[in-house]
């Protein structure tokens, strides 16, 4: 017996029928499932008469969604639409964007190369600002050159009573009269004067022959010290 010829099924698949229906019913807004089923039943009754028609129909829609040929703009219960293929203008825009990005990256690289100049400018600015530090040093030196209580007392003892000595009270008055700007706002003035006298006695620059409450006299070492001031 001759072998039977195998005939291929030329019926279009459900997905193709849905695409056909969408194109035929195209009004710019898509088509509902009901409208698509009606179109297939009206134009392909042999396919629509299959008992599992609804199952095949829904499965074809699902496959079309997965392959990005269909989409539901308003969700599965809304209308079904064909996905528009990417246009040539979109490709052109993409190329233009790539060119712009390339230009921007080139410009950014050029600006990166120029950054060392900024660093040099900053370094130069730092060098110019160095004299300010010198000014601070000068100010510090001026402050440190202010007369001390020791120096005021040595000067006072020499200036009063022909250098023969002076009482604490007389020395304090002398200091307030001669150096008002140095002591007028000092709260612990008495303490500073007494402490300076005590240190002068200990260092051998001053002496109190009659004891702490007596006259303050200047010694040879004190006279030599005051000359160097």
Swiss-Prot record:
Single GO term (MF): nucleosomal DNA binding
Primary localization class, coarse: nucleus
Pfam families hit by this protein: Linker_histone
Compositionally biased spans, kind Low complexity: 84-94
Cellular component terms per the entry's GO annotation: fungal biofilm matrix; nucleosome; nucleus
PANTHER family referenced in this protein's UniProt entry, alphabetically: HISTONE 24-RELATED, HISTONE H1
UniProt record similarity statement: Belongs to the histone H1/H5 family.
The protein's role, per its UniProt record: Could act as an H1-type linker histone.
Protein name, as recorded: Histone H1
Organism: Candida glabrata (strain ATCC 2001 / BCRC 20586 / JCM 3761 / NBRC 0622 / NRRL Y-65 / CBS 138) (Yeast)
